[in-house]
A protein has these predicted regions:
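Hydrophobic helical membrane-anchoring modules
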Residues: 50-184
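Acceptor/aglycone-binding surface of glycosyltransferases and processive sugar-polymer synthases
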Residues: 1-55, 81-96
Length: 184
């Protein structure tokens, strides 16, 4: 991390975290740096024509490997920076494109792996977390509005919002934990 430019390090760290969530491979430290070696069995199983062809290709491949139950190993390499290379990446475009791609891949993986191929209760945990976060948005806005207009919040409103927020976070963390255990 000392040799990588700070902006790249931050972007790569966020992208790696989102890729861990989307792919289910929590042990892969850096999904964007390195190389990919796969067996003939992988090549025969995964439809390579469906894999994203641009910057998100390693992320898409990791998700597909997880859906089909393949093991992945993280091989650490030493990246080389500041030798005159010029990145052609448009950060604003990549952030939007990759975020949408990873969300789509995450939802596809959850559906394929935990609903269609073999059911797992973590689907309910993710669904409850989403439901509670949707409920929490208007509750939080209301609590903030009441506080800004009156200077105080009725305790029941505050406690309800706190409860819904806490439960949403807990459901999300348990879903991620189950996913992590299932993908080892």
């Amino acid at each position: 991390w000392k040799i990588i430019p700070k902006r790249r390090y931050l972007g790569n760290s966020v992208l790696s975290l989102l890729t861990k969530i989307a792919s289910g491979y929590w042990h892969v430290a850096d999904s964007q740096t390195g190389y990919t070696a796969v067996s003939l069995h992988v090549l025969q199983t995964i439809n390579l024509d469906q894999i994203y062809t641009n910057y998100g290709m390693p992320n898409d491949l990791l998700v597909r490997l997880n859906v089909y139950g393949f093991r992945v190993r993280d091989v650490v390499i030493r990246p080389i920076y500041n030798i005159g290379e010029k990145s052609g990446i448009n950060i604003a475009k990549v952030v939007f494109t990759m975020s949408f791609l990873l969300l789509r891949l995450f939802l596809w993986r959850i559906k394929e792996r935990y609903v269609i191929r073999d059911f797992h209760p973590l689907v309910f945990f993710y669904a409850f977390a989403l439901f509670l976060f949707i409920i929490d948005i208007p509750l939080s806005i209301r609590v903030l509005y009441v506080f800004c207009t009156t200077g105080s919040v009725p305790p029941i409103n505050f406690l309800t919002t706190l409860f819904v927020s806490t439960m949403g976070v807990l459901f999300l963390l348990f879903a991620m934990w189950f996913d992590m255990e299932e993908s080892k």
